[in-house]
């Protein structure tokens, strides 16, 4: 493509030369360069550019280049839309005319292609038959698709481009609407429904765009009356085209647009326009199945014609009134349950839709059938209509004659059908349906039950299924109680007396109320009669009340007369002031609008003048620049033509765009050409080497490997295919033979039975006919008898049902009272059980706490007793080591710990605990009894050193007197006196606890009470303590007073020394260099080292371990800890 921009006349001359030699595409490119130039020469006049533009568009039409034509049209519009609008209009109209002519020629050519048939005797050639079977089209359709459709598409694109080109330009507004109407005619002519929808959407989008406020003065403004009128006329053409194409949705949208434009206009539309609007609107409503709004539109048309049309004739008035009357009578009766429609509608509620439709008709509220009939009476439509249709109104809305209703209506329908050109034929089916509904409603007021054949006889123009459908719709929409008995072929009306859902009185003739309606309104009627009776008994009461109210009103008027008079005067004054203010504001607003319009016109003229001056200056400047640029480009063109002679130069130029070429000089272009040539040569050599190696190795290896595999695969596949075919063929032959034999045998067997079947069927048919007639007669007689019997039984049954219902209610009341008493008793028992369980729990908790307290006291006594024994032994040893001549030791005084001297043990060695020996309790390891049969230790807290002399009456026991050891639940005194007063021990109650068998006094083998099986202690710890007690035992076992071995030697008493700090009281191993402060009371004064102590035994699992107790530190800081 040449980079040199030619002058328009030169380009046109060169294009004609290309056309002469048959190169139309080159001619179009030459003309396109003129319009594609970025430095456009605006100083050229339309006389020079217009011929170029016509030739350019002619070539675009010839080559079907609609997008290229669009580009040129946009450039031409930018040049002449403000300078010479006539030239732009001529160009666009010429372009569309050329496209339409070529489309018509293509249509004629397509029609001629189907006529030119070589052989008239053989119209359906094999090729045409195959094509129709493949694509489902005939020859004409295929011809249109190949010849006509491309030109139709081109014409459609041309219309769309022109509309987009002129949509916002106020100077071309008339041309825009003319093209829109041409597009409507195009859609009608070629039946392009989809394109018509797109065109409507495009026009609606353009209207929305011009409705927006625009700051540009040349744009279209919707506030202008001319613009509104043009848009209104275009929408009326759109509505007419949509109705002709039967696109009712687009017609409805067009009606909405028309109504919006009429509302936007300040002027009242012309009566002719409104008449056309109402006519089209009535047609759209009828096609949509909305008879109510169809009749409303016809009524509005009648009112408009009567008020605005001056020379209307009587025949025309009669025709219009008759049309309105028939359309109103054809409206279906209103539904008693319009709220049911809400469950069917999906997008908007019926009320909103009805309000929108009423808004299109200029109504304040939605119309109804009753309101339209009242409006007909008010406007004297009935008297102006034809006599036969006035009689139709009397039959359907006034008279009550169900037996002759359908006959009378059928006569009127026959008159309508007799005229084939009558416009009332479309209402015949709707009138029949309304008549059937009226018939059913009137029949229901006369009969309670009617036979279905009789009802069909009354409904002359309805068959069985249609009448059944009418009955179902009456129940669904008109709230009628109807039951169809298919077995008895009858219809029941108003059988449910307890149900009445419709409160408003149905319109139309009514003879009497239904029984359910009478039952429902019984109280209302009683109230009316009672009020009448009161008025008859006391007639002066209401009169006196009226006199009193009249006197009160006169008194209030006399008091407020002056005030009301002044208020009315003030109101009149305010109204006058308000009117004057509104008039003044309107005058000021009109003056302001007039001033603004004049200012706007002046500013537009001034802006237009400035724009023209600026454009002239810009043209002069660009003309000089273009001349210099053309000289430079001429030189560059010569250099580029030289480079184009080589292949490398052509590739280089393809890589560079126009901007880069314009920036480079000839030397730079030559350097780039050499560089590109070198790169291309190196790349080509590398590619050749790489491809040579790759192809050589790959092909050679592939063929060597695939040869044996392919041969083996082919051999195996041939063998398999042959075996498979043989098996399938043998199986198919066997199956076909077997099926053939079976079919022949079955055919022979059935042929023999055919005559017998015919004879038997005829004989059976004759016999059953007589039997059926006799049985039918008997059935009817039995049916009548059964009906009478069931009526009598129903009376007895209902009486019995009422009695049984009363008895059932009594029985249910008795059961309910018994059930309440039972529940109250169960609730009282439950409360009592909970109270007893709570008492037991509290008692068990007290017993447990008392046992723990006594155990702690016993351990404290045991510890102190052992300390005293050790002190006594040490004192005896010191006395033995002293010399005989020394002074005698003073006799130790009696104390509450030791008792009198006479109470000393006879065998102290037997009671003295062993030293430096760890003695197990026998609970977790072998004790003294198990190892050698020795007697267990006597130093438990139950038995002191003097316990073997308890029977002797000694008073020196280790027990403390008073209430120190007494628990709140002890059964007897814990302390016993000496001598004879001690008596039997009574402290062996269920709440005392002790050790094992070794804890019994010497010489007695009686085990302790708490070691017996099933004792209260074991029972308490195993049965009464649940899961919530395990946490308490676990916390007791985790105390800080369990000794260094963590309770591994239960039954022993450990001594904890004084702690240097808080950390010394912790259990577990001590750090190196620190002394262990824990000691066993059975060890001697010099305990073994930590490493010489015996190995700890593993603690066996035991749940019934009582909690330990800490008796507190002694005078040396040591604390005894008893482990169980």
Curated annotation (Swiss-Prot):
GO biological process entries: formation of cytoplasmic translation initiation complex; translation reinitiation
Compositional bias (Low complexity): 900-910
Coiled-coil segments: 96-124
Main subcellular location: cytoplasm
One cellular-component annotation, GO: eukaryotic 48S preinitiation complex
Ranges of compositional bias, category Basic and acidic residues: 812-851, 860-883, 928-952, 960-990, 1007-1048, 1063-1100
Subcellular location: Cytoplasm
One function term, GO molecular function aspect: mRNA binding
Record keyword Protease present: no
Region (Disordered): 812-1124
Keywords, sorted A to Z: Coiled coil, Cytoplasm, Initiation factor, Protein biosynthesis, RNA-binding
InterPro entries reported for this sequence: EIF3A, eIF3a_PCI_TPR-like, PCI_dom
Stated family: Belongs to the eIF-3 subunit A family.
HAMAP family: eIF3a
Oligomeric form and interacting partners: Component of the eukaryotic translation initiation factor 3 (eIF-3) complex.
Protein name: Eukaryotic translation initiation factor 3 subunit A
């Amino acid at each position: 493509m040449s980079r040199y921009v030619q002058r328009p006349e030169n380009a046109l001359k060169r294009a004609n030369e290309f056309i002469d030699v048959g190169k139309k595409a080159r001619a179009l490119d030459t003309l396109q360069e003129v319009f594609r130039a970025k430095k456009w020469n605006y100083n050229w006049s339309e006389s020079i550019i217009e011929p170029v533009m016509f030739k350019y568009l002619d070539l675009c039409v010839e080559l079907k280049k609609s997008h290229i034509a669009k580009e040129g049209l946009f450039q031409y519009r930018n040049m002449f839309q403000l300078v010479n609008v006539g030239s732009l209009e001529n160009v666009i109209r010429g372009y569309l005319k050329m496209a339409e002519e070529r489309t018509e020629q293509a249509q004629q050519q397509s029609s001629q292609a189907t006529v030119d048939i070589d052989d008239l005797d053989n119209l359906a050639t094999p090729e045409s038959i195959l094509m129709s079977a493949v694509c489902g089209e005939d020859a004409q359709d295929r011809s249109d698709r190949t010849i006509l459709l491309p030109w139709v598409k081109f014409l459609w694109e041309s219309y769309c481009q022109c509309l987009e080109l002129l949509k916002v330009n106020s100077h071309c507004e008339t041309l825009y609407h003319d093209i829109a109407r041409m597009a409507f005619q195009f859609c009608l002519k070629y039946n392009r429904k989809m394109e018509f929808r797109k065109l409507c959407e495009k026009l609606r989008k353009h209207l929305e765009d011009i409705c927006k406020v625009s700051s540009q003065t040349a744009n279209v403004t919707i506030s202008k009356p001319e613009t509104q009128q043009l848009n209104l006329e275009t929408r009326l053409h759109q509505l007419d085209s949509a109705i002709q194409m039967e696109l009712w949705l687009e017609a409805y949208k067009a009606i909405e647009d028309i109504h919006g434009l009429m509302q936007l206009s300040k002027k009242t539309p012309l009566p002719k326009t409104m008449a056309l609007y109402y006519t089209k609107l009535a047609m759209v409503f009828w096609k949509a199945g909305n008879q109510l709004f169809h009749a409303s539109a016809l009524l509005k048309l009648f009112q408009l014609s009567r008020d605005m049309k001056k020379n209307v004739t009587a025949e025309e008035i009669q025709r219009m009134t008759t049309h309105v009357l028939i359309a109103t009578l054809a409206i279906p009766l209103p539904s008693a349950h319009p709220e049911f429609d809400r469950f069917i509608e999906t997008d908007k509620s019926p009320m909103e839709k009805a309000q929108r439709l009423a808004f299109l008709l200029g109504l304040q509220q939605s119309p109804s059938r009753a309101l339209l009939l009242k409006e007909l009476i008010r406007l004297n439509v009935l008297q102006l209509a034809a006599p036969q249709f006035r009689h139709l109104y009397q039959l359907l809305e006034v008279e009550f004659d169900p037996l002759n209703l359908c006959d009378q209506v059928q006569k009127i329908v026959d008159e309508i059908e007799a005229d084939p050109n009558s416009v009332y034929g479309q209402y015949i089916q709707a009138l029949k349906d309304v008549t059937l509904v009226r018939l059913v409603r009137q029949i229901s007021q006369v009969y309670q039950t009617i036979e279905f054949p009789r009802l069909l006889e009354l409904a002359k123009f309805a068959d069985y299924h249609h009448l059944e459908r009418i009955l179902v719709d009456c129940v669904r929409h008109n709230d009628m109680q109807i039951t169809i008995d298919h077995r008895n072929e009858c219809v029941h009306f108003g059988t449910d007396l307890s149900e009445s859902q419709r409160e408003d009185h149905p319109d139309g003739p009514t003879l009497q109320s239904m029984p359910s309606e009478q039952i429902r309104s019984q109280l209302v009627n009683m109230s009316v009669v009672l009020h009448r009776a009161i008025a008859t008994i006391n007639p002066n009461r209401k009169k006196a009340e009226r006199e009193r109210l009249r006197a009160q009103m006169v008194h209030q008027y006399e008091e407020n007369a002056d005030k009301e008079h002044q208020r009315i005067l003030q109101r009149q004054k305010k109204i006058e002031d308000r009117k004057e203010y509104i008039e003044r504001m309107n005058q000021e607003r009109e003056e302001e609008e007039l001033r603004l319009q004049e200012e706007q016109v002046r500013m537009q003229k001034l802006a237009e003048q400035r724009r023209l001056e600026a454009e002239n200056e810009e043209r002069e400047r660009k003309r000089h620049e273009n001349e210099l640029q053309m000289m430079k480009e001429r030189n560059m063109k010569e250099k580029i033509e030289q480079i184009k002679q080589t292949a490398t130069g052509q590739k280089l130029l393809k890589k560079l765009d126009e901007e880069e070429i314009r920036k480079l000089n000839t030397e730079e272009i030559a350097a780039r050409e050499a560089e590109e040539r070198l790169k291309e040569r190196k790349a080509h050599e590398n590619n050749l080497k790489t491809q040579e190696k790759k192809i050589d190795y790959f092909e050679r290896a592939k063929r060597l490997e695939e040869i044996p595999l392919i041969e083996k695969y082919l051999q195996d596949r041939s063998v398999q295919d042959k075996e498979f075919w043989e098996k399938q063929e043998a199986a198919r032959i066997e199956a076909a033979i077997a099926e053939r034999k079976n079919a022949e045998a079955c055919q022979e067997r059935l042929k023999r039975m055919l005559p017998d079947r015919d004879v038997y069927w005829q004989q059976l048919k004759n016999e059953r006919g007589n039997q059926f007639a006799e049985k039918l007669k008997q059935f009817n007689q039995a049916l009548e008898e059964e009906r009478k019997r069931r009526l009598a039984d129903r009376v007895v049954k209902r009486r019995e049902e009422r009695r049984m219902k009363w008895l059932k209610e009594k029985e249910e009341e008795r059961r309910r009272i018994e059930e309440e008493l039972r529940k109250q008793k169960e609730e009282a028992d439950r409360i009592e059980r909970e109270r007893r369980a709570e008492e037991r729990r509290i008692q068990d908790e007290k017993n447990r706490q008392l046992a723990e307290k006594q155990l702690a006291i016993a351990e404290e006594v045991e510890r102190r007793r052992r300390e005293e024994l050790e002190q006594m032994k040490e004192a005896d040893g010191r006395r033995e080591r002293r010399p005989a001549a020394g002074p005698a030791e003073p006799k130790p005084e009696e104390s509450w710990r030791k008792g009198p001297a006479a109470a000393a043990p006879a065998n102290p060695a037997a009671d003295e605990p062993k030293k430096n020996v760890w003695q197990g309790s026998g609970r977790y390891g072998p004790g003294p009894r198990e190892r050698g049969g020795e007697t267990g230790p006597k130093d438990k807290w139950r038995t002191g050193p003097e316990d073997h002399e308890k029977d002797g009456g000694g008073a020196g026991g280790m027990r403390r007197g008073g209430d120190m050891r007494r628990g709140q639940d002890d059964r007897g005194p814990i302390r016993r006196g000496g001598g004879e007063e001690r008596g039997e021990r009574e402290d062996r109650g269920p709440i005392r606890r002790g050790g094992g068998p070794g804890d019994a006094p010497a010489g007695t083998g009686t085990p302790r009470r708490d070691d017996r099986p099933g004792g209260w202690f074991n029972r308490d710890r195993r049965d009464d303590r649940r899961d919530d007690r395990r946490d308490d035992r676990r916390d007791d076992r985790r105390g800080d007073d369990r000794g260094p071995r963590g309770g591994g030697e239960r039954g022993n008493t450990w001594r904890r020394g004084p702690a240097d700090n808080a950390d010394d009281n912790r259990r577990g191993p001590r750090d190196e260099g620190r002394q262990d402060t824990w000691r066993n009371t059975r060890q001697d004064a010099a305990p073994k080292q930590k490493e010489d102590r015996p190995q700890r035994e593993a603690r066996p699992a035991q749940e019934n371990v009582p909690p330990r107790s800490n008796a507190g530190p002694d005078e040396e800081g040591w604390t005894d800890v008893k482990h169980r």
